[in-house]
From Swiss-Prot:
Family: Belongs to the three-finger toxin family. Ancestral subfamily. Orphan group II sub-subfamily.
Keywords: Acetylcholine receptor inhibiting toxin, Disulfide bond, Ion channel impairing toxin, Neurotoxin, Postsynaptic neurotoxin, Secreted, Signal, Toxin
Function, in words: Binds with low affinity to muscular (alpha-1-beta-1-delta-epsilon/CHRNA1-CHRNB1-CHRND-CHRNE) and very low affinity to neuronal (alpha-7/CHRNA7) nicotinic acetylcholine receptor (nAChR).
Protein name: Weak neurotoxin 8
Domain of life: Eukaryota
One Pfam family of this chain: Toxin_cobra-type
Single GO MF annotation: toxin activity
Signal peptide boundaries: 1-21
Disulfide pattern: 24-45, 27-32, 38-63, 67-78, 79-84
Tissues in which the UniProt entry reports expression: Expressed by the venom gland.
Length: 86
């Protein structure tokens, strides 16, 4: 009986989604060391480079539910593993 109960507990733990959360870099600088744990539903890390005017660049990194769209002259890279948006 104890073996059956233990087996059921193990199967339940394995089959349940234990709430894995993604970790992404989150900062506006080119060189970044600040991480954030993404919220539920955010399964994408992104790195965006925005060109505001000639020789003026803005870096944005963070979590998202989907890969963000860009404007002309902007670049975005998306990935789905921990700390992949370096």
């Amino acid at each position: 009986m104890k073996t059956l109960l233990l087996t059921l507990v193990v199967v339940t733990i394995v089959c349940l989604d234990l709430g894995y959360t993604l970790t992404c870099l989150n900062c506006p600088e080119m060189f970044c060391g600040k991480f954030q744990t993404c919220r539920n539903g955010e399964k994408i890390c992104f790195k965006m480079l925005q060109q505001r005017r000639p020789f003026s660049l803005r870096y944005i990194r963070g979590c998202a539910a989907t890969c963000p769209g860009t404007k002309p002259r902007d670049m975005v890279e998306c990935c789905s593993t921990d700390r992949c948006n370096r």
